[in-house]
Amino acid sequence: MKNFTILHLSKTKKPKISYLFIDNFLFLLFFNVLKVDYFCIELAQSHKTNFIFKKVYNCSIMKKNRRIKKYNWFFMLFKRMGVIKYIFIIYILITFLISLFLYWPITHTESFRTSIKNNEVTFSYIDALFLAASAFSDTGLTPISIAYSFNMFGQALIAISVLVGGLGIFTLKVYILQTIFGSKINVFNSALTQIERGSADGGKTKKIIKVSVSTLLISLFVFTIIFTFIFYYSPYGKFSDIEAAKSYDLRTFNPYEFNVQNPKGDFGKSLRYAIFHSICSINNAGFDNIGSKSLMPYYEDYSLQIFTLIAAFIGGVGFPVIYDIYKKLNSYRKTQPRYRVTLFTKLTLITYVFVSIIGLLLTFLFETTSKNQFSFWNQSQYGSTFAKSFAVIFQTQTTRSSGFITTDYYNFTQQTLLVHSILMFIGFSSASTAGGIRSATVAIIFLSVVSMLVGKKQVTAFKRQIGKENLIKAINVFAIGIFLVIIGVLICYSTTNLNANSILPHEKKFDTSHILFVVCSAFGSTGSPMGIIPNFSGYGKVTLIIIMIIGQLGIPQTILIWGRNRKSNEHVRYIYEDVAIG
């Protein structure tokens, strides 16, 4: 919000000017996160229609008001750093701000505060920072149970963090100012939104934001209604059965939530679960406020799982793809011109389908051929063949972005864990709520390999040539992503006592494959839980925090943070020389 100059017009009196210095407060509180061009809102009364209308126009108050200029040195300092560094600093500041609230006992439940006081559980500031980074990056990894540890205020704070982080803080700001106030957006804010959730075509950024954010907000409202009815009427929820909830062998599947009230028939609890689950599904964050087992109590509720997959797909497909689909559907109307879908949308959707099918087939292959009695397919607790097949489909799709689980990942084979780690490493679409190296990156690398095999010098797709700069960027993103995952696995493995609490034979035993799974889950902003996060040391949690932030920003943007703000002029060109490769 900015300094508003409100002009009250009448026939007899002169305009009365009143200034609301809201921007100074917002600047000091959030370091000018919400800063845009100064503009005036003129409210006048029409003599003919007797309606109040407003006209939003830019004005040069900043040059005239010296008192305001002295508060802008922080903003100008950030602005000189460049767009990428500005976004990075704001993300870090917001993450620390959220962590302070989550560490504040006012957000905790009474039982959780008592447990901390009696040293029954440990909750350090690193845990709060980890949870804040996981929420704002739309990951979903957590060292503690949200349902048991945080009250309604704490859960609402986490949900808002997920929503703002998923839509994008700058994107949401531009959407509000553009849609509600009709304000014009300056070049700097356009660059912020283009980097955060825009497309390669900067001219379409404002349109993409308006269409995509509106679509996601409408979807959020619709899915909230759907999930409310499901939670209210679902007969499949497994809650509060004390005898069934007890599991003497932790290696077997047990979907029951102990000491949790079933939301069936409780509209207030159903609505609260639905709002939280809708926000996390749309924004591809694997959080839940049901209990400590994600969606395991609804293992047999296929309607909940299907709508969860649809919501996760809408949020993870990306802002440019949503805009393309909207324009394509709108072009079928007779009054609208024909619209050509971009190459980015085609590559994203085709790669998503292709990778999902490959991952699904490999998962079925490895699980059905397993001879381990504790493996997923061989446990009778998972029900019929149809129930197991649907669970495989759900888990394979959620590894692409959302991270919800209806099964215990500990029961999957080592081969399946590796496949799902690769799926999380790939992620979903660029400019979306998902993470990873993104689908378009994999598509470009795959097309370059195919071009080399068939002897083509150009990388083409759908009668379009992919530039060498995009190919080099895709290879760099892939290589740096592999490097980050390897470094993350080494640090987490060397600083974590994996089986500190696993003494008895019937308890879970973790190894390197589980570490790899968690690191890929953090990098892909997936948040699929493995139950190993509480065993991580402070160094391991900080490593995952860094990986989650990089997964949200994207590797190209992270590289530019440490680069020069100005492009260097290469006046000297050297002679080419071939180098033997392979």
Label every model-predicted segment:
Residues 1, 5, 11-18, 24-33, ...:
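Membrane-proximal intracellular helices of multi-pass ion channels
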